[in-house]
């Protein structure tokens, strides 16, 4: 209900009335809290990740405490064959020095035949801005090599 009152017209953009999969996240900046959520319908080309932030000491039950990021913070990247990224959650590296976003996406457009059966899980390292807030980056192409997470056992 709080997200509905915050996003208003986002609920109706492009005939999709869905905001789902909220994930509460404490950034490095302990003065803030975040809620990442998936916006738009997963069957549309516009499925993406949105962000709400609030001061950590605010009344988090008051919709006025929350600020909505004006644009999606993570969205499709057709040139990387990433469509409909959403369902984000966050995990730390084994030693806690790095943070990764776990999400799902498709290699084909969401409105293509067979798209609804083609989601795959993805893992991508996030960075931090100068204020300690997360930067999710650009969705990487499936199968792109990445460095082992910090603290991973050597094999």
Residue ranges and their predicted role:
Residues 22-41, 91, 98-107:
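Hydrophobic core segments of beta-strands in well-ordered, beta-rich domains
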Residues 44-55, 109-123:
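Structural motif
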Residues 65-89, 93:
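Conserved blade-ending motifs and adjacent loop-strand segments that build the rim/top face
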Residues 121-122, 128-155:
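Peripheral, solvent-exposed domain-edge segments
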């Amino acid at each position: 209900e709080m997200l509905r009152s915050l996003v208003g017209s986002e609920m109706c953009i492009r005939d999709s009335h869905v905001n789902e999969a909220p994930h509460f996240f404490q950034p490095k900046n302990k003065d803030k809290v975040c809620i990442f959520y998936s916006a738009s319908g997963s069957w549309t080309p516009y499925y993406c990740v949105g962000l709400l932030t609030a001061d950590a000491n605010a009344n988090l039950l008051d919709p006025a405490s929350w600020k909505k990021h004006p644009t999606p913070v993570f969205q499709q990247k057709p040139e990387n064959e990433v469509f409909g990224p959403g369902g984000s959650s966050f995990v730390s590296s084994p030693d806690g020095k790095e943070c990764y976003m776990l999400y799902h996406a498709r290699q084909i457009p969401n409105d293509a035949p067979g798209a609804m059966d083609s989601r795959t899980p993805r893992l991508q390292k996030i960075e931090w801005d100068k204020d300690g807030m997360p930067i999710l980056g650009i969705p990487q192409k499936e199968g792109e090599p990445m460095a082992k997470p910090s603290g991973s056992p050597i094999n």
